[in-house]
């Protein structure tokens, strides 16, 4: 549930051409020592920024021919190595400037204005226009965005709401553990080897559904009712149909009646229908029982009772939060388990930290979350090496100068998250998975931007962080995570960065006393 929560973080602009002939080599791509522009104090023109930007359509064709769309992240690393810490690109009609050094976003974010604007997902806005539905806060801009965001911040991202979320998310985490124990028992081998991607998808959807809608979908059960299964299918179909429409205008697909557009509409209809059912259930519960016994009813019910946003505004924003908080969170957890399986000694360090926190707090989960810095560092390290989004973007509202280059107002500027995570000038030994690097006291400013920054940072950040931390606590307390083979898994771009092949993990129960 990170920067989209997903799409909040997903880069939808297309990096410049120059894709290496091989899809990738066996080693992890690392940014080499970046080139620097002329050190003179003379500010250079926008047209002097290096890069491939003079023929956008030719670049688009070359990019498509070289399968660059699935390798956007590696292309960006290649381009930073070729052009230096700043370069300009034009792919089709997308014209942008790309930056990599952590001191650069400080300048960028100062120029984002009162109403920060980033690229929107045209497929999502096209559906809402087609169905005459309101935009949620993820897709809004201007004063309408700001007024909605201020209200939602208090209910979703304020530190004060953490106590509301923890009991709900902790319950889902415990149910996931129980589900894994059942899988191990049924295997008859005292272990369970599987690709966890679908299980983690269900876990993430159950978690975010519990917090947002205040009800369980039942995805941790062996039998999933048809209504919940349809909801899962709609979420999956929505993501599957979004990615191709990044490159083909949805309006054109709608005019020709393309199946991908019809499927996209069907998927969103199902997602919004789920929100409608939840709203009806909430009103029914409020009429029947005014005493909630102190239990947090969920974000949707809280916003309805607050009565500061219209029902349609609430439904739109909550639906976007839910849609953006599934794949992003589940993929980050999958990469984290993958890295812990590759580093068993580190896994034991995290397990020991969790054990100390459990003993010190007598199991008070809210207090435990304050005592697991290495676990939190592991999640930051995962987002450094395996970010869900390729880049973080802003349209600047004033002229700025970066690396002695003038960048005019209105330009789309992108910070390469994937590339920065592999820059040895920013992260020593970038190829190493080292959660301890986040425990240091030196300046880490603008180095961990997986959830974005400033007023337009990921709205679901508090939910996502809590959900992932609780998941790791429960998994570390109950299972040892192993990998079958020492095979390195790379990323591929499909709206977000995903493992390019299944990650097989083996879960073994910890024996009593371990």
Curated annotation (Swiss-Prot):
Gene3D superfamilies: Cytochrome P450
Range of the transit peptide: 1-39
Catalytic activity: 6 reduced [adrenodoxin] + cholesterol + 3 O2 + 6 H(+) = 4-methylpentanal + pregnenolone + 6 oxidized [adrenodoxin] + 4 H2O
Subcellular location(s) per record: Mitochondrion inner membrane
Tissue/organ expression: In the ovary, not found in early vitellogenic follicles, barely detected in postvitellogenic follicles and abundant in post-ovulatory follicles.
Residues noted as binding heme in the record, renumbered to the chain: 458
Source organism, top-level taxon: Eukaryota
Any single biological process term in GO: C21-steroid hormone biosynthetic process
GO molecular function: cholesterol monooxygenase (side-chain-cleaving) activity; heme binding; iron ion binding
Major place of residence: mitochondrion
Keyword Mitochondrion listed: yes
Keywords: Cholesterol metabolism, Heme, Iron, Lipid metabolism, Membrane, Metal-binding, Mitochondrion, Mitochondrion inner membrane, Monooxygenase, Oxidoreductase, Steroid metabolism, Steroidogenesis, Sterol metabolism, Transit peptide
Gene Ontology CC, one term: mitochondrial inner membrane
InterPro entries hit by this protein: CYP11_CYP27_families, Cyt_P450, Cyt_P450_CS, Cyt_P450_E_grp-I, Cyt_P450_sf
Cofactor(s) required for function per UniProt: heme
The protein's name in its UniProt record: Cholesterol side-chain cleavage enzyme, mitochondrial
Name of the gene this protein is made from: cyp11a1
